């Protein structure tokens, strides 16, 4: 969650949030085209109680709080499972250990579940950079050694498409209130061939994080407001070179591009830059041509994004020293939170740590907005640039979900136990808590946007409207980037990272040559998987 991240967010222009200031009705949100929040139901007392654990301003929660919330939210489990019903069942759960969250939270939430049901859970904890290789190994060998997995929707083509997942029972849909999702996470996301597999636990999007003390009267940028376009971002990065950071007194830096790969996940950060250049409002595609799967990664829009990064690499001091070895974990947690640099894009984790992480020094000088746009966009259909402002925020990774694998098939007791555990950590009430406190997960249910629940818990009304609205701005943007759930998507991303690293290190002569190398590698991946099947799945993933 990102509640502690800031007291105020600087945003320019008329947005959904500024129009909603002081609005009390959910109808106001609906009129703006956003998701209509589901009103609090019979669990309102429980929801109010868990929202006060540990309470506003009482510090970052830990295992004791996670276990308490898990215990308080056991009601739906007890309605469907008898005490000790799963005694003797052992389950293996594979997930992340990022920033001591993810699996750490799940352990806490599930300890009361284990005590009640009698089941035992064994854990496979993975760092972000190790996640894709570990999963791809299981996919390639079809040797799945886990019963439950924390996984993003982009991998559904690799897993559900190959029969590695177990279909969600109807009773689970009832327990988790399956339909309570913001629009972009509704099916077909989480489904394959009409069958449901995913319990949503997150709603991913990248937002723009910036240092408010770099802007305003007397600031080192000389600009009143943060940038609205990537062209401005690069210019600011050049302008602050050689100046002193107003907070630390160390060298000032502009945008923090991660120049080192991150197990395929680093591709999302180049996509942040490229999106407004390449995602034309009249074209649903941005990675491949729809009818041929021909890569677009080497078209003028993508090349411009790569060139923007290379332009900053050429300027000694534009980036911190040794940026070539900085992955997104470095840029977010070792640089930006520690006071190095003034701008970056990231998931909500940065916000949730800005005021709760002991290593953060920027809590009072951090602001957030939607990812910058561009003053031009490349029209792939016409093969020409159009000099018009364009926005294309990035719903990067489509959020984390929890899935049950085919290892449980043939054992009804184990299958029920696995789905019960998954449903518990993806439940409606527990998800409100993960949205409201540091967890690594962003709001994703319509019911998360009931402002009164947050205000009753002690959060400032204006802040909550601003914070939740910043997610809706991206989720509901008509030109947002929603990646295709096709087999091999992270093979494409990983090889792109490899070639980008070569380009950023000067091993290729230009941005175009770098992009051409990625495109050639992507063509080989498509042919190895099967072009015709990829075209079919690519179209299906875009609803065509």
Region spans (language model):
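Hinge/lid segment of periplasmic solute-binding proteins
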Residues: 52-85, 152-207, 236, 269, ...
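Extracytoplasmic/periplasmic solute-binding protein
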Residues: 92, 192-201, 206, 231-294, ...
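Short, well-ordered beta-strand elements
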Residues: 48, 87-98, 119-124, 148
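Extracytoplasmic/periplasmic substrate-recognition and gating elements
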Residues: 189, 218-221, 315, 359-443
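N-terminal secretory signal peptides
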Residues: 1-18, 25-32
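Long, aromatic- and glycine/proline-rich binding clefts that accommodate carbohydrate-like moieties
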Residues: 46-50, 61, 75-80, 90, ...
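Extracytoplasmic "Venus flytrap"/periplasmic binding protein-like
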Residues: 108-184, 213-228, 334-335, 342-343, ...
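Glycine-centered hinge/linker elements that transmit conformational signals in sensory
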Residues: 234-239, 283-324, 370-374
């Amino acid at each position: 969650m990102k509640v502690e991240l800031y007291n105020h967010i600087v945003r320019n222009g008329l947005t959904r949030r500024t129009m909603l200031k002081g609005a009390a009705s959910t109808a106001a949100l609906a009129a703006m085209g956003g998701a209509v929040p589901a009103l609090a139901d019979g669990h309102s007392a429980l929801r109010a109680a868990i929202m006060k654990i540990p309470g506003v301003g009482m510090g970052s929660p830990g295992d004791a709080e996670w276990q308490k919330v898990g215990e308080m939210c056991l009601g739906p489990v007890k309605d469907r499972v008898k005490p000790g019903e799963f005694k003797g069942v052992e389950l293996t759960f594979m997930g992340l250990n990022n920033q001591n969250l993810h699996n750490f939270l799940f352990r806490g939430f599930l300890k009361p579940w284990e005590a009640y049901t009698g089941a035992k859970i064994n854990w496979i904890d993975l760092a972000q950079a190790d996640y894709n290789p570990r999963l791809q190994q299981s996919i390639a060998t079809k040797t799945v050694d886990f019963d439950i997995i924390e996984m993003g929707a982009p991998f559904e083509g690799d897993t559900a498409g190959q029969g590695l997942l177990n279909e969600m029972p109807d009773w689970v849909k009832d327990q988790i209130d399956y339909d309570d999702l913001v629009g972009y996470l509704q099916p077909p996301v989480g489904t394959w061939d009409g069958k449901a597999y995913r319990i949503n636990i997150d709603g991913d999007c990248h937002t723009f994080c910036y240092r408010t003390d770099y802007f305003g009267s007397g600031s080192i940028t000389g600009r009143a407001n943060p940038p609205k376009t990537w062209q401005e971002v690069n210019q600011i990065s050049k302008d602050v070179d050689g100046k002193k950071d107003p907070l630390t007194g160390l060298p000032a830096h502009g945008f923090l591009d991660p120049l080192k790969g991150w197990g395929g996940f680093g591709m999302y950060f180049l996509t942040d830059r490229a999106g407004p250049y390449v995602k034309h409002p009249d074209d649903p595609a941005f990675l491949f041509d729809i009818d041929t799967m021909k890569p677009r990664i080497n078209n003028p829009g993508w090349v411009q994004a790569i060139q923007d990064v290379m332009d900053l690499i050429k300027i000694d001091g534009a980036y911190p020293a040794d940026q070539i070895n900085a992955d997104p974990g470095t840029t977010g947690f070792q640089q930006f939170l520690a006071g190095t640099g003034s701008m970056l894009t990231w998931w909500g984790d940065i916000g949730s740590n800005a005021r709760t992480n002991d290593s953060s020094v920027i809590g009072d000088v951090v602001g957030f907005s939607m990812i910058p746009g561009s003053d031009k966009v490349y029209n792939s259909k016409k093969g020409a640039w159009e000099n018009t402002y364009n926005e294309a925020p990035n719903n990067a990774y489509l959020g984390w979900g929890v899935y049950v694998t085919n290892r449980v098939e043939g054992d009804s007791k184990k299958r029920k136990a696995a789905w019960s555990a998954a449903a518990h950590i993806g439940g409606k009430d527990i998800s409100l808590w993960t949205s409201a406190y540091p967890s690594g997960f962003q709001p994703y249910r319509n019911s998360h946007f009931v402002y009164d629940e947050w205000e009753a818990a002690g959060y400032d009304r204006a802040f909550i409207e601003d914070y939740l609205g910043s997610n809706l701005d991206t989720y509901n943007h008509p030109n947002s980037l929603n990646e295709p759930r096709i087999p091999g998507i992270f093979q494409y991303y990983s090889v792109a990272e490899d070639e980008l690293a070569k380009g950023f290190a000067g091993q290729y002569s230009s941005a175009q040559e770098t992009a051409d190398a990625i495109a050639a590698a992507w063509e080989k991946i498509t042919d190895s998987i099967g072009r015709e099947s990829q075209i079919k799945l690519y179209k299906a993933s875009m609803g065509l």
